[in-house]
Amino acid sequence: LKCNQLIPPFWKTCPKGKNLCYNMYMVSTSTVPVKRGCIDVCPKNSALVKYVCCNTDRCN
């Protein structure tokens, strides 16, 4: 799996076991991702932070 980095068009190959790509957004600015990368389990959203996860190459 390859996930986008925060600075397009760069991406990285995920290590074994981290088979989701994710975008992390601040709820206050939910259009601009704060962090992107590979993760094993999609984190739960909180009052301040929203996560969007997906499982195909460079889908974040």
Curated annotation (Swiss-Prot):
Q: Name one GO molecular function term.
A: toxin activity
**Could you tell me which cysteines form disulfide bridges?**
3-21, 14-38, 42-53, 54-59
Check the record and name the InterPro entries matching this protein: Cytotoxin_Cobra (IPR003572), Snake_3FTx (IPR003571), Snake_toxin-like_sf (IPR045860), Snake_toxin_con_site (IPR018354), Toxin_cobra-type (IPR054131)
Q: Which GO terms describe its biological process?
A: killing of cells of another organism
Record Gene3D superfamilies:
CD59
Q: Looking at the record's lineage, which domain of life comes first?
A: Eukaryota
Where in or outside the cell is it found?
Secreted; Target cell membrane
Q: Does the keyword rRNA-binding apply?
A: no
The alphabetical list of record keywords is:
Cardiotoxin, Cytolysis, Disulfide bond, Membrane, Secreted, Target cell membrane, Target membrane, Toxin
Q: What main location does UniProt list?
A: secreted
- Assigned GO CC terms: extracellular region; membrane; other organism cell membrane
Could you say which protein family the record assigns here?
Answer: Belongs to the three-finger toxin family. Short-chain subfamily. Type IA cytotoxin sub-subfamily.
Add the further remark from the entry: Shows very weak hemolytic activity.
Q: What is this protein called?
A: Cytotoxin 3
